[in-house]
């Protein structure tokens, strides 16, 4: 959490860990590894230096590893896991492997993060920004992964920037209210402008 609040460049950090383990890696190339452990990837099948990063990630973010184990326990005991919004994912054929982990451990680690982000937060943000754009000529025309594409009328550029800034300030509070959770991770919206 501290790194998020301080704006740490996590991709540069990943690059540093892999490079110091003996494999020079650019910040751009390191991006493929930065969040992979969060979504279930391991050091298995990686180079020795890349595997060092995955092991380092688990040691540094022990809370995430503990959460993954909690998800595994829930899936094994109940046959499902839940996202913070209450969306459930069933694992009817789950089994425990010899190493103690569930048979679908990667999916178990991936679903709560990806689902909450792409099935809940992104659409929620889209609807909120659409509401803030009401009465304007500018409009949302598409969403791609975690990005919203807004067709901005030239006369409304500053207004749309203000809408994004307002959404940025309110989003966490609205998420907490919507799902009655303590969502204490800042969501920082970037605003990039280009010709169409």
Give the positions of each predicted feature.
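Conserved catalytic core of nucleotide polymerization and phosphodiester-bond processing enzymes
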Residues: 1-196
């Amino acid at each position: 959490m501290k790194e998020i609040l301080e704006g740490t460049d996590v991709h540069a950090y990943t690059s540093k860990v892999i490079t110091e383990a003996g494999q020079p890696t650019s910040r751009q190339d390191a991006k493929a590894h930065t969040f992979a452990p969060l979504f279930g990837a391991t050091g298995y099948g990686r180079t020795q230096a890349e595997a060092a990063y995955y092991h380092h990630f688990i040691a540094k973010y022990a809370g995430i590893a503990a959460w993954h184990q909690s998800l595994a326990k829930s899936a094994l005991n109940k046959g499902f896991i839940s996202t913070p919004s209450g969306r459930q994912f069933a694992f009817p054929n789950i089994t425990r492997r010899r190493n103690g982990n569930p048979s679908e451990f990667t999916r178990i680690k991936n679903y709560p993060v990806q689902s909450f982000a792409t099935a809940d937060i992104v659409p929620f943000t889209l609807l909120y920004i659409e509401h803030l754009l009401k009465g304007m000529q500018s409009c949302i025309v598409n969403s791609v992964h975690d990005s919203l594409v807004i067709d901005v009328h030239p006369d409304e550029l500053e207004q749309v920037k203000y809408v994004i800034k307002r959404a940025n300030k309110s989003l966490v509070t609205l998420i907490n209210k919507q799902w009655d959770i303590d969502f204490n991770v800042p969501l920082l919206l970037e605003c990039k402008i280009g010709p169409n």
